Amino acid sequence: MEPLPRAVWLLCSWFGISFRRRKRSNLRRAVELPGKPPFFCRENRAAIEVNIETDLGKVHIINTHLGLGWRERLVQAQLFTSAEWRAAIAGDTPLILLGDFNSLRGSRPYRTLSRHLRDVRELIQATGPIRTFPTRFPVLAVDHIFVNGAVQPLSLTVHRSALARIASDHFPLMAEFALSPHRCPE
């Protein structure tokens, strides 16, 4: 993988999330997410938006890390489904929204997102929960990948390694996707 230019890498890793790429890409924006954090955790939360150029056209990717309080997460999930954010992405542009949502399936933030996007776990018909947290003994599935109709997931796995266990308290999700040539704008 090629690292992002240093200035972009510093910006993108500011709130504990990062983006690295193999293909040509451009950073659309890195934003601090809204919502009042709970008293026990005053961490800033963010989202990084990038466009990746593929042989089939542009793919829009948003990497995020939502807060710990349920009200904070709900406000943040509503941001991603707002008219402003949806209008910024062309209707047929493949979209992947991924990250640490700190939300279980069935929670209000999760339901807010799944009304507009599809959960990769459900699309590949995972036979059991794909647990990512905590790395010491993963019992919760709070990390998710959502896609729109222009993206077809092919696989979803949890990357479990000694290095992943050291790098974070969450194991990373890894997914492969297919894009429909007629749905990818140039």
Language-model regions: role of each:
Residues 1-2, 57, 78-82, 178-186:
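N-terminal, active-site-proximal structural segment of metallo-dependent hydrolase catalytic domains
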Residues 17, 84-96, 102-186:
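Metal-dependent phosphoester-hydrolase catalytic domains
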Residues 10-12, 47-51, 63, 144-145, ...:
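Conserved hydrophobic/aromatic beta-strand scaffold that supports enzyme active sites
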Residues 66-68, 103:
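Short, glycine/acidic-enriched loop or turn micro-motifs at the edges of active sites
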Residues 40, 70-71, 136:
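Acidic-and-aromatic substrate-binding clefts and catalytic sites of carbohydrate-active enzymes
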Residues 47-54, 58-62, 74-98, 109-110:
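His/acidic metal-ligating clusters that form di-metal
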Residues 4, 70-72, 165-167:
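Solvent-exposed loop/turn segments connecting transmembrane beta-strands
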Residues 1-58, 157:
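Structured beta-strand-rich core segments of catalytic domains in phosphoester-bond hydrolases
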